[in-house]
Amino acid sequence: MDNYEKQVYTGRELFLKYDQDKLIKKYGLKHDEEYLYLKYIGTEYRINRRNGAVEYATGEEWTDCREYTVVMTIYDFLCCSEQEILPPFTGQWQPVGRFVTAGSSPSTDPFVEKYARAFSGKVEEVKQACICLGGKQTKRLAGADLTFEMPVLPEFSVLLQFWDGDEEFPPKILLLWDKVSLSYLHFETTYYLQGDLLKAILQIIG
């Protein structure tokens, strides 16, 4: 078992310590006797209430989820906050680097730049992919070619901005987070979620 698998099993054990009825009420989760259900970046997931295993829907079937970032983001979303009542979202967006004194915005991360290059020249394709994932196009901010509010978890959205490249400037992606986001996720998890979202968009546009 590698370190990633060990951390996934640690996440399962942590999840199983929580009062699931409280989680259902807190996050408005669909549920039955065996599973809790939630949508993450346009895909339906379920969590086994007995052993904590995460599965995703593929047509009529359910498949064991082995994507570390997906599994850990779902666990963190459900287990991060100790508050019984979560703070309401403010609609005030900021780069993730604003949440810490020492830290940089993912917009400067080579990982994000890789996706920006992949999206270059494909504004319409990126737009349609965002719509496919449930995104809502909003007014353009800071001259971005696309600005979308993307629902990524139950009642939780991020703001995605994309500037296409030209002769003077390279393409750029920026994800903005509601100022109360860290009441819902740990700082490190925002990077997992960011990667999962950009990967999902790229898979759709091909």
Where are the language model's segments positioned?
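Conserved aromatic-histidine-acidic binding/catalytic patches
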Residues: 62, 103, 114-117, 148, ...
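Amphipathic, interaction-prone secondary-structure segments
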Residues: 24-50, 139-164
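Intrinsically disordered, low-complexity regulatory segments enriched in Ser/Thr/Pro
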Residues: 44-69, 163-188
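Short amphipathic C-terminal alpha-helix that caps PH/PH-like domains
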Residues: 74, 78, 194-197
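Conserved binding-pocket/active-site segment within a compact domain
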Residues: 121-183
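A recognition module on extended beta-rich or small alphabeta surfaces enriched in W/G with H and D/E
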Residues: 178-206
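Domain-length accessory/inserted modules outside core catalytic folds
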Residues: 45, 100, 111-116, 142-144, ...
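Short Lys/Arg-enriched alpha/beta "domain-start" segment
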Residues: 1-34, 40, 70, 77-134
